[in-house]
Amino acid sequence: NSFLASRKPVMIIHKDGDSTYIAADTLFSGLRKYDSLERKVFTQTDTLKTTLAVNTNDADSSIRYFIGFHNVRIFNDSLQAVSDSLHYSTVDSTFKLFGEPVVWNDKSQITGDTLYMFTQNQKPKQVYVFFNSLIINKTAENLYNQIGGRTLNGYFKDGTIDYVRVKGT
């Protein structure tokens, strides 16, 4: 129940009429067995339907994950992102972007060393940026708000950035 695709594959995740496209030089998907002793995750689960033929009858016994290597690109109607590498798990619907990730949402751009994008129903819910975080937001023609720091924690409302907290220098 795993696959490895190279030569610039594209994966499409469909849910409730919305699609998220993930492209990379190489994509891998596999199953991880469910461990009842494992520490519980702190975010809500988000179910998704993929274009893959996956047996979901025994959903409690395994967890699907996706890994993208080199030149990762993510596209959907509420955000776009690029990075060097990606890890995505169906447990918490979190995109973990590594290697100079950049995320665009509406009129905002977020960058940092490592970026975790928490989603719910394929819409961004929260973003956490580790080290060298920077957010740029266009306010008017040729005017921008820029905030940088060690870490950034941002929250979304209706798919748009609503609140941001930046710590450190």
PLM ranges: what are they?
Residues 1-169:
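Structural signature for solvent-exposed beta-strand/loop edge elements and short helix-capping sites
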